[in-house]
Amino acid sequence: IRIRILNGTSHMVLNYLHAGQVNIAFASDDQDPAVYDVRHCVDTHTIFVAAPDYPCDFTHAYSMEEIAAFPLILLERKASSRLYLEQYFQQHGVTIQPEIELGSHNLLISLARIGLGVACVTEEFSQSGLGRGVILPLRTDFSIPPRAVTMCTLQGVTPTSAAKRFMDFISESNKMAYDPGHSYHFTTG
């Protein structure tokens, strides 16, 4: 069995799927069911993090306006999670302008960790840094609605037996992967 993993935005990995470069794509939850067979994998939560010595108050519940005033470290504009974040803030009359834009979630954590600003990250993908205390979550007085990561295959295309087995493995693993009892997501009000 040959496994090839390609990384990219939801749009990019779905293009890989259409081009036949991959059998399965993991993407955000807004995919057309007429085009894709979609399996829910996990809900994700957006949080803001900073280095423990960053000049902010980790006990204060920040408003959207206060978060927007920080030097923000965000994913690049074409990332679906970035677009989702911007739309959410705009719906509440707040514009966000990042100081730093990156193409990698790991880089968001790395730059926040060294004190370059406040990063907007996916909580579920940041557990290592949060658990080790190299980044800390900022409390907010708002809660960004969760998003879903889905496993997509092309509608009408039967996955290979190996791909099907992998999909079943992922589906079973996801039932145990995230323990909400250890969430670092803090909101008030």
Predicted feature residues:
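Central regulatory/effector-binding core of bacterial HTH transcription factors
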Residues: I1-A34, L102, F186
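A local structural motif
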Residues: I1-I5, Q90-E99
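Hydrophobic residues within well-ordered alpha-helices
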Residues: L17-H18, I67, S110-L116, M151
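A ligand-binding cleft/hinge motif common to bilobed small-molecule-binding domains
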Residues: D29-V35, Q91, N106-I135
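Flexible hinge/capping segments at coil-to-helix
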Residues: V35-L72
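Short beta-strand->loop
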Residues: D37-I47, R132-P146
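Ligand-binding clefts/hinges and TM-proximal coupling segments of bilobed small-molecule sensing domains
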Residues: K78-Q90, V94, D168-G189
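A late-sequence structural motif
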Residues: L136-P180, F186
